[in-house]
């Protein structure tokens, strides 16, 4: 029997329980920085050393945390379903939890690319993306052809090269699961609209859902607890 397809869209709420700082944390890494200075191309052009230091800190933090029960539960769905994770997060916790098919919409913290390997039409050249693990990159660290390396992150104002791939996954899904991101935040707000009319949508978020849609089941809790409830619900439907 062919496995049902589940598209899982995840945001900051999934990794928050592992201790990953988000924009909205009261005492997170972001508190000491302006978003415009460290997460835009303009900020990079003004002060690349500041941007590199910021992402070096985030990389070091990532090395100290582990996937939580929500990451592990999402990975476990692959036992019975054809699962693709679409994440807005730049950490590697889904990979470390065991998920095998992951689309990183906003890039990956543990990777870098030459700063000139990007254009609005084609995005970045995948063959020039390098995995550096949890190490630092500094001014003067270059590709083989002498170009300064930058974080492999989609900054504010930059195109999201993998959005079309994500849309295809959502359109083909039999079940759409949204965890740790609200429908007020793009691209989640835009992606959910591509689900088929017959596709049930489950949202795990402790906050109210601002959208009224008969397909939506809102599991109002944090990601770890919500994933337990979600698995319980779909297990009963499969009986």
Report the location of each language-model feature.
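Conserved catalytic core of sirtuin-type NAD+-dependent deacylases
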Residues: 1-239
């Amino acid at each position: 029997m062919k496995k049902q397809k589940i598209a899982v869209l995840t945001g900051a709420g999934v990794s928050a329980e592992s201790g990953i700082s988000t924009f909205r944390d009261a005492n997170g890494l972001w508190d000491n920085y302006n978003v415009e200075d460290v997460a835009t191309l303009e900020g990079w052009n003004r002060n690349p050393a500041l941007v590199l230091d910021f992402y070096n800190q985030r990389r070091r933090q990532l090395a100290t945390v582990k996937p939580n029960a929500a990451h592990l539960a999402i990975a476990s769905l692959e036992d019975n379903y054809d699962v693709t994770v679409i994440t807005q997060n730049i950490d590697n916790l889904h990979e470390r939890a065991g998920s095998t098919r992951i689309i990183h919409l906003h890039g990956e913290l543990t990777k870098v690319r030459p700063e000139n390997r990007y254009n609005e039409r084609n995005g970045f050249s995948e063959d020039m993306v390098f995995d550096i693990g949890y190490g630092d990159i500094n001014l003067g660290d270059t590709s083989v052809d002498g170009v300064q390396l930058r974080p492999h992150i989609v900054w504010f104002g930059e195109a999201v090269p993998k959005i079309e791939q994500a849309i295809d996954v959502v359109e083909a899904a039999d079940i759409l699961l949204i965890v740790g991101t609200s429908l007020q935040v793009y691209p989640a707000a835009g992606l959910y609209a591509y689900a088929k009319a017959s596709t049930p949508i489950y949202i795990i978020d402790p906050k109210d859902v601002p959208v009224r849609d008969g397909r939506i089941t809102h599991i109002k809790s944090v990601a770890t607890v919500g994933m337990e409830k979600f698995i319980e619900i779909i297990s009963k439907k499969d009986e």
